[in-house]
UniProtKB/Swiss-Prot annotation:
Name of the protein this chain belongs to: Large ribosomal subunit protein uL16
GO biological process terms, semicolon-separated: translation
Biased composition (Basic and acidic residues): 149-160
Location of region: Disordered: 138-160
Quaternary structure annotation from Swiss-Prot or TrEMBL: Part of the 50S ribosomal subunit.
HAMAP family: Ribosomal_uL16
Family classification: Belongs to the universal ribosomal protein uL16 family.
Highest taxon above the source species: Bacteria
Job description of the protein: Binds 23S rRNA and is also seen to make contacts with the A and possibly P site tRNAs.
Keywords: Ribonucleoprotein, Ribosomal protein, RNA-binding, rRNA-binding, tRNA-binding
Classification of source organism: Bacteria, Bacillati, Cyanobacteriota, Cyanophyceae, Synechococcales
Ranges of biased composition (kind: Polar residues): 138-148
Length: 160
C-alpha cells in the first residue's frame, strides 16, 4: 500500500476541504480518466483496491496512472480510552481529494473507450467520493469546436 517513506512530522491536523482542485485537474498521461465530483478522503487501501479492480479488468492491455498519493496521516485513539493523554498514533494514510481532481488515468493502444469505461466503473465502486469518467478526446473536440466558432465570428467581423 502507498504511504510516505518519511515525513517531517508524524501527526497532522484534520484540516478542511474547501473549494475545487486547482492542480491535478487535467488529463496528463493517458486518454481516459476518473475525475472526482465531490470532496473527501481516499485511503491507501481504497486506492489499492481500485487499482487492483482496474488492473484485473484490463489484464495486460494498457497502462494505469495513479494521480493521487496518500500523504496525510490519520490518528486514532484505542477503544475505551479515557479523555486526555495526548493525540493518538497514526493508523492509516489518506489522500485529500477535492472536486475536479483526476484520481486515475488509463491509456494504451489496446484500450478502447468501452474497456476503459468498464474498468473505471469497477474502480468507482471502491471509492468513497462521487466520480465521473472523462476522455481527453472529447475535451479536444469541445475545445476545437469553440475555436471554430470563435474563428467564424472573427471572420464575420472582418467582412463587416
Amino acid at each position: 500500500m502507498l504511504s510516505p517513506k518519511r515525513t517531517k512530522f508524524r501527526k497532522q491536523h484534520r484540516g478542511r476541504m474547501r473549494g475545487v482542485a486547482s492542480k491535478g485537474n487535467t488529463i496528463a498521461f493517458g486518454q481516459f480518466a476518473l475525475q472526482a465530483q465531490d470532496c473527501g478522503w481516499v485511503t491507501a487501501r481504497q486506492i489499492e483496491a481500485s487499482r487492483r479492480a482496474m488492473t484485473r479488468y484490463i489484464k495486460r492491455g494498457g497502462q494505469i496512472w495513479i494521480r493521487i498519493f496518500p500523504d496525510k496521516p490519520v490518528t486514532m485513539r484505542p477503544a475505551e480510552t479515557r479523555m486526555g493523554s495526548g493525540k493518538g498514533n497514526p493508523e492509516f494514510w489518506v489522500a485529500v481529494v477535492k472536486p475536479g481532481r483526476i484520481l486515475f488515468e488509463m491509456g494504451g493502444d489496446d484500450i478502447t473507450e468501452e474497456i476503459a469505461k468498464e474498468a473505471m466503473r469497477l474502480a468507482q465502486y471502491k471509492l468513497p467520493v462521487k466520480t465521473k469518467f472523462i476522455s481527453s478526446d472529447k475535451n479536444l473536440e469541445v475545445s476545437s469546436q469553440e475555436n471554430t466558432k470563435n474563428n467564424k465570428e472573427s471572420q464575420e467581423e472582418v467582412k463587416q
